[in-house]
Amino acid sequence: TLMARKDLPINSLKDLVTFAKANPGKLSYASAGVGSGQHVLPAALWHLAGADLIHVPYRGAQAAYLDLLGGRVDLFFDLSSTARVHVNAGSVKALAVSGAERNPMHPDVPTIVESGVAPLDLESWFGYFVPKKTPMDIQDRLRSELAKVIAQPDLQETFRKAGGKPLSLNADQTRALVRRDV
């Protein structure tokens, strides 16, 4: 979720990019450090949108939040599950989410693509992998057992509450996902 400090006079990603293009280097965005997800995702967004913002790297997300909430930086992109607390409290404004679809935690917040500023669709995902030479019968058993775990209603609900979408992909689907995203 892309968050803006609550007193920033911008209420949409489209307006933010318009302002940033007209005022290069005037807006800043925090990250949890150089190379972190909170750095790479917005850097890609600003690049694709043709906007020049100042990157302010912190040593972790907590320090970035302190300065966003204190109004010392303008923007911060973080996981929706973490951002939710601050968005719901009204201490920041949510401008966009990075996934292909709106996030259930922030159903009124448009995606980056919906905002029309960049063709950017990025989501975090986790997978289980085994060495290439693992026998197929072991791979099949692991896949089957993991699918049973992922299908459990309590686990599904835990993922949803945290803003996640639990998926159980077969080998071909997983290979396609890795080829697309990695």
Model-predicted segments: where are they?
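Periplasmic-binding protein-like
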Residues: T1, A96-K132, L169
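Short secondary-structure boundary segments
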Residues: K6, L79-S81, G99-A100, K132
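Conserved helix-loop-beta element of the AMP-binding
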Residues: L16, I54, S91-N103
